[in-house]
């Protein structure tokens, strides 16, 4: 059975004090969540160490939002996978469209990051997704297949999460129809050699649409942006009712 993973991506939000306040409000709200659901918070680097200490032994896992592919070296501003595992981090988001758009990341560099993450014992969450222009041009399938194949070269698919995040739905409120997200995620699954890989949907997931999204047979979780910043809304997503 594929693991259900609900992950929040805080992006560049929350100071350490704000993160601690979030956890105080959030943890009691998910005490009764199904044990089969993995809950992950992917937070800024500055929040990781303090949150790791507060969450130690609990059910919420921590993830980073990026990682470099080299183990060490003259890479100013970068973080290695070993630095993350040392403080108890389990997951790392790789290849998010914002990293691709603003920082020039590619399928090839995403692949290097995935390999480095796995080598260090982290679970990579590889993001793929098409732009509005690509969808309008009928290129969704080709774009997604290319991203998946290039991102997974030599990757161990037993230690992997994929997130389908159509770029046009991220932070716009314009959610991809649940059935269409299910179709594309089914296409992604066809490219894999391991049928048990967890594939999430991301893109304006919120408390109002999560039940319909999670009712789809191919969707194994959600990568949640803005709705993960508030304890009540993210707890409602974790406690979805498909």
UniProtKB/Swiss-Prot annotation:
| Binding, substrate | 9-11, 171, 204, 225-226
Question: What is one process in the GO biological process aspect for this record?
Answer: gluconeogenesis
Q: In which pathway does it act?
A: Carbohydrate biosynthesis; gluconeogenesis; Carbohydrate degradation; glycolysis; D-glyceraldehyde 3-phosphate from glycerone phosphate: step 1/1
Q: Which residues form the active site?
A: 96, 165
Q: What is its EC number?
A: 5.3.1.1
User: Per the record's keyword annotation, is Isomerase included, yes or no?
Assistant: yes
- Keyword Cytoplasm on entry: yes
Q: Where in the cell is it found?
A: Cytoplasm
A single Pfam family it belongs to is TIM
Instruction: Fetch the InterPro entries from UniProt.
Output: Aldolase_TIM (IPR013785), TIM_sf (IPR035990), TrioseP_Isoase_bac/euk (IPR022896), Triosephosphate_isomerase (IPR000652), Triosephosphate_isomerase_AS (IPR020861)
Q: Which GO terms describe its molecular function?
A: triose-phosphate isomerase activity
**UniProt enzyme class:** isomerase
Entry keywords, A to Z: Cytoplasm, Gluconeogenesis, Glycolysis, Isomerase
Chief location category: cytoplasm
Q: How does it assemble?
A: Homodimer.
Its family? Belongs to the triosephosphate isomerase family.
Q: Tell me the function of this protein.
A: Involved in the gluconeogenesis. Catalyzes stereospecifically the conversion of dihydroxyacetone phosphate (DHAP) to D-glyceraldehyde-3-phosphate (G3P).
| The protein's name | Triosephosphate isomerase
Species the sequence originates in = Synechocystis sp. (strain ATCC 27184 / PCC 6803 / Kazusa)
Q: Which gene name belongs to this protein? A: tpiA
């Amino acid at each position: 059975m594929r693991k259900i993973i609900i992950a929040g991506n805080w992006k560049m939000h929350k100071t350490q004090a704000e993160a601690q306040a979030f956890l105080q409000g959030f943890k009691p709200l998910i005490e009764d969540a199904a044990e089969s659901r993995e809950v992950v918070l992917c937070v800024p680097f500055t929040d990781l160490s303090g949150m790791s200490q507060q969450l130690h032994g609990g059910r919420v896992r921590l993830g980073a939002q990026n990682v470099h592919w080299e183990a060490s070296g003259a890479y100013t501003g970068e973080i290695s996978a070993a630095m993350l595992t040392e403080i108890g981090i389990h997951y790392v988001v790789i290849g998010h469209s914002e990293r691709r758009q603003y920082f020039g990341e590619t399928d090839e560099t995403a692949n290097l990051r995935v390999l480095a993450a796995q080598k260090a014992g982290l679970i990579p969450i590889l993001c793929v997704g098409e732009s509005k222009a690509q969808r309008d041009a009928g290129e969704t399938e080709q774009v997604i297949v290319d991203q998946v194949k290039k991102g997974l070269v030599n990757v161990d698919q037993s230690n992997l999460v994929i997130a389908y995040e159509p770029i046009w739905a991220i932070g716009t409120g314009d959610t991809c129809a649940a059935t269409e997200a299910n179709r594309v995620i089914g296409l992604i699954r066809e490219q894999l050699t391991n049928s048990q890989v967890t594939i999430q949907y991301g893109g304006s997931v919120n408390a109002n649409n999560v039940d319909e999204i999670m009712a789809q047979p191919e969707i194994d979780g959600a990568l949640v942006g803005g709705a993960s910043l508030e304890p009540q809304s993210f707890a409602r997503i974790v406690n979805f009712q498909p």
